[in-house]
Swiss-Prot record:
Belongs to the UppP family. It catalyses: di-trans,octa-cis-undecaprenyl diphosphate + H2O = di-trans,octa-cis-undecaprenyl phosphate + phosphate + H(+). GO terms for cellular component: plasma membrane. Catalyzes the dephosphorylation of undecaprenyl diphosphate (UPP). Confers resistance to bacitracin. Bacitracin is thought to be involved in the inhibition of peptidoglycan synthesis by sequestering undecaprenyl diphosphate, thereby reducing the pool of lipid carrier available. This is Undecaprenyl-diphosphatase. It holds the Pfam family BacA. Its main location: membrane. GO terms for biological process: cell wall organization; peptidoglycan biosynthetic process; regulation of cell shape; response to antibiotic. InterPro entries: UppP (IPR003824). It is an enzyme of class 3 (hydrolase). It is a multi-pass membrane protein.
């Protein structure tokens, strides 16, 4: 039987996942921090994280359903659809290879709040530098991307294996530096999230399959639905925001949040060193 506090924990973490998954502020980092603050851990947390990530990715699938349908129906004959699909596969593969090789090691050594805080600050500084650097836009839309554009974005996505880095942050900022327009970089980041997150969820789901229990269905349902709703809100808001704004506000948020975590640890207010995902 699910108690009220467990339901509240599921709701809180679902909101955090939904709001942060597609913003360049690191959803994994926020999950580690918030889960530690509300004391949500153990085997249930491992399975729960997989479920709420699926909720978030479903929001992107729904938001871009027309584009996805156009690509799927156009695959047999349309060169544009074929090239777009190939670019996604090319961008996806580096994360598959490096994820299989290094995922367990990274999770063991780097999934802690101090790593998250450091990565938030460093990533924020890099984002500010990238935003202030002059960009020569070579690629206006995702349909104009070349296979080399896709490969480079896929390689920088691998940096997000370090918690606190941000998958969307690394791919969007990387895309800007590689000559993609702000719109193209953001949209390709969303599309690339689909195979990347689904692949990670399937891999983790199989690996931790014994942690899924029927008794946790209600907890998972709350997290899944909440994550879906708030991810939808975040995706739509970000697409509107980037049309007229830079990513600097996210960079400053990362720096401030990371420094706050480091300060509370340094002064001994919170024992972040023991916080694990």
């Amino acid at each position: 039987m699910m108690d009220l506090w467990t339901a509240a924990q599921a709701l809180i973490l679902g909101v955090v996942e939904g709001l942060t998954e597609f913003l360049p502020i690191s959803s994994t980092g926020h999950q580690i921090i918030v889960a530690d603050l509300i004391d949500f851990g153990g085997e249930r947390a491992m399975a729960f994280n997989i479920i709420i990530q699926l909720g978030a990715i479903l929001a992107v699938v729904w938001e871009f359903r027309r584009k996805i349908l156009d690509v799927v129906t156009g695959l047999p004959k349309q060169q544009q659809a074929q090239r777009f699909t190939l670019n996604l596969l090319i961008a996806f593969m580096p994360a598959v290879v490096l994820g299989v090789i290094f995922a367990d090691t990274i999770h063991h050594y780097l999934f802690n709040a101090i790593t998250v805080a450091t990565a938030l600050v460093v990533g924020g500084v890099i984002m500010l530098w990238a935003e202030r650097r002059e960009h020569t836009v070579r690629t206006e839309t995702v349909d104009d991307m070349t296979w080399s554009d896709a490969l480079k974005v896929g390689l920088v996505q691998c940096l997000a294996m370090i918690p606190g880095t941000s998958r969307s942050g690394s791919t969007i900022i990387g895309g800007l530096l590689f000559g993609l327009s702000r719109k193209a970089a953001t949209e390709f980041s969303f599309f690339l999230a689909m195979p990347t997150m689904v692949g990670a969820a399937v891999y983790s789901g199989y690996k931790y399959r014994d942690m899924f229990r029927p008794d946790d269905f209600a907890v998972f349902a709350i997290g899944f639905i909440t994550s879906f709703i708030f991810a939808m809100i975040a995706v739509r808001a970000l697409l509107k925001f980037i049309a007229t704004h830079s990513y600097a506000v996210f960079a400053w948020y990362r720096i401030a949040f990371g420094l706050l975590i480091l300060a509370t640890w340094q002064f001994g207010w919170i024992d972040w060193a023991s916080a694990k995902a």
